[in-house]
């Protein structure tokens, strides 16, 4: 869906469901 999750993942993890870490931001498929 939307490529931007509005979350950063500098620590390496994303808390938003359906989002994965594409450092340094979380992205959605």
UniProtKB/Swiss-Prot annotation:
Function text: Probably participates in a plant defense mechanism. Has cytotoxic activity against human lymphoma U-937 GTB and human myeloma RPMI-8226/s cell lines.
Highest taxon of the lineage: Eukaryota
InterPro entries: Cyclotide, Cyclotide_moebius_CS, Cyclotide_sf
Intrachain disulfide bonds: 5-19, 9-21, 14-26
Keyword Disulfide bond tagged: yes
PROSITE patterns: CYCLOTIDE, CYCLOTIDE_MOEBIUS
Protein name, as recorded: Varv peptide E
Annotated Pfam families: Cyclotide (PF03784)
Changes after translation: This is a cyclic peptide.
Protein keywords: Disulfide bond, Knottin, Plant defense
Signal sequence interval, chain numbering: none
Cross-link (Cyclopeptide (Gly-Asn)), chain numbering: 1-29
Presence of the UniProt keyword Disulfide bond in the record: yes
GO terms, biological process: defense response
Family: Belongs to the cyclotide family. Moebius subfamily.
Domain notes: The presence of a 'disulfide through disulfide knot' structurally defines this protein as a knottin.
């Amino acid at each position: 869906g939307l490529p931007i999750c509005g979350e950063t993942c500098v620590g390496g993890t994303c808390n938003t469901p359906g989002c994965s870490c594409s450092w340094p931001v979380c992205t959605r498929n």
